[in-house]
Amino acid sequence: LLQMCRNMSEMGQKILYVSGEESLSQIKMRAERIGNFTKDMLLLCVNNLEDVEEYVKKDTPKVIVIDSIQTIVTDDVESAPGSVSQVKEVTARLMRMAKQTGIAIFIVGHVTKEGTVAGPRTLEHMVDTVLYFEGERNAGFRVLRAVKNRFGSTNEIGVFEMKGTGLAEVKNPSQLMLDGRPDDTSGSVVVCTMEGTRPILLEIQALVCQSSFNLPRRTSVGLDYNRVNLLLAVLEKRGGIVMAGCDAYVNIAGGMRLDDPSADLGIVFALVSSFKNRAIPSDMVMFGEMGLSGEVRGVSGAEQRVREAAKMGFKTCIIPRSNLDNVKKMKDLGDMKVVGVANIQQALEYI
C-alpha cells in the first residue's frame, strides 16, 4: 500500500497514510527502499479516529490508508483497541466519511492463522471490497485476490513479483509459473485456467507410487483434496486404470491455488502419466471439466485459453469437443493442433 500511495502521489493525487502501528522513522525506512516521495504523500502516526477526522477537515485528501483498523480507537467507545465494538464503530465512521466526502479509504486488517480477516464478520459486510494479498513464504511472487467486490468480478487477480525496490507487476504470469519446468518428466502436465478474464498456464505435478500402507495416502497441495479423490474414482471406473493400492500426491507448481474445474483433465493425465511412468509431451496443454460418467464437459473462455497456449509456444491443445467448433474458427493459432475429446476414453486413446 505504501508503494501504491507513492505511485498515486506522483500522479498529483493527495494521499494520507495513517499508521497506528509504526512510527514515522519506521515508515521512513520502508519508504527509502521503495524510492522518493512527493509532497502530496502525507504521513500521520496517530491511534485516535478523531485526530484523523480533524486532519481531513483541514486538508481533504483523495485517498486515505488506515494501517491498521485494529489499532485505531474512538473516544465514543470505552473498550480496548481491536475489540469488536471499536472495530465496528471505527469502520462505520470511516465508511460515513468516505460516502460524504468521496474519499477512497483503504483499511488494512489483521488476519487469523487460517488466513481470514480477524475480528467481527461485520467488518467484511460493511466495506465495498475485500482483497487478500497472498503468497507462499518461499515464493517470489504474490497474488492479489478479491473475495468480495460490489463493483465487479471477484475472479480477477493480480500477480506481483517481489524485488529489491518493492513489488513489480508480472505482465505474463504463465511464463513465470512455467519457468524451470523439466522436459520429458512423467507426472507433469500443463493446463490453461482462467482467473477472471485472464488465462494463466499452470503446471500440475503428480506422483503415484506403490503404497506400503493398508490405506493408501492421498495428498493434494493447491487443489481440493476431495476433487482429486473424485477424479481417481472416475479414472478407475470409466478409464479402467486402477490406483487403489497406490499413494497419490498432486501439487500445483509455484505455490498457486487452483479452484477452476477445467483443470480436471490435467489432473487425470498427470496421475496417469506418473502411474505409467510415461511423460506427456512438453509442448502439449489441455483443459476440460470431468463428469462422473467420464464425459469431458465444455468450459467458458476456451478461445482465450487456446490463444494464450499458442502464444506460449505449445503445439498441441486437448480441449472438450463441445468447445472445438468455436476454437476452429480462430485464425491466430499458427501451427497449433487442437484436439477435441468427448470423454476420458478418447483422451486416453489420443495420449
Model-derived regions, located:
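Conserved RecA-like ASCE P-loop NTPase motor core of nucleic-acid helicases/translocases
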Residues: 15-19
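Conserved Walker A/P-loop ATP-binding site and its immediately adjacent core
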Residues: 20-26
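Peripheral, non-AAA+ core regions of ATP-driven protein-machinery
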Residues: 2-6, 12-13, 28-42, 48-63, ...
